[in-house]
Amino acid sequence: MRKIFFVLFLSLLTSCSDDKKIDEPQITIGDNYDKKAMLVNWAENIIIPAYKNYQIEVNKLLEEVNTFKQNPTIDNLNKLRVSWLNSYKAYQHVAIFKIGKAEDLYFIGHSNTYPVNIIELNKNINTQNYNLTSLTQFDKQGYPALDYMLYGLADTDNAILVFYTGADALKYRNYLTDLVTDLKNNADLLLKDWEANKNTFISNTNNTSSGSVNLIVNAYIEYFEKHIRLGKVGYPAGKFSNGIQPNKIEAYFRKNVSKILLNEAISASADFFNGKYYSNNQTGPSLKSYLDHLNVQRNNKLLSTIISDQFSLIKIKNNALDDDFVSQINTNNNKMLEAYDAMQINVSYFKVDMLTALNIAVGYVDSDGD
């Protein structure tokens, strides 16, 4: 019955799409793929190791904050900045997995909402009256807030240091500490939750909206579409506005690490698709091997190969960008739009071809018509 239903589903989908002239994926019907093995690989070799590394980097960040708090020097400020970037890069590998506790904690919102609301952030500092666990605090905390605190308070390092040594130094030091403590608390909670519920995640192989594969695949595509394609590139490039918005780049005050963070996120997405272990180059059961098992093709070419080739093109387009996205947007925004378009192609492969082949429905709100 399941095979018959799926054939009817594909027939209906094809008939509804004739006017759009979209090439449908060619699929060998019959899904006996070992989803449990894939879930084991995801949990044990990718997700949990990524969270462990993230926790390590956040702990280092807190250590550097405490050192700087006790001895606010230029040298300690620079060490703190290095740790901030390392932690920010590690975050790109765990933000993908917005399911369960990460969704409950609004992990992405608390960690990486930008641009920063500078006026309200400074009000937090001055009044010392804030609760960073509140949903109203997203744009006053996380890595973007640290970006402002470490790079945006003034134009020079010496001038920035005055905020941490002057009359209101304690307020600034406390806010800096609270920002990182909030990141640490969430990192600890998320790793603990994954370790405690790993077996439940692995055993949930049902092909339903609450099944582990469905949840992860939807989270994966949503993050790629909304937070990488749109958040890191589309919004600042003015894709859905009347003009460019360079103030909306990631790490606006540091500026020349936006490409680093974008490339880190793209690598994390490509690695997950291929089932690459977080800690080494070994690979295991994955979306790629799942699609290959089903022999999913587009124009007589394996869909997994098409997606992988597109990831390579995305990296080429991204590497052509200036390290400083503000400069890139202001001087030649077309390159930003080309990078966006390259990512959009994989969004289409994910949402049209891959989800159809895996018989998974889109489980999040699609707000921009893709």
Model-identified regions with their sequence ranges:
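C-terminal motif of bacterial Sec signal peptides marking the signal peptidase cleavage site
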Residues: 12-15
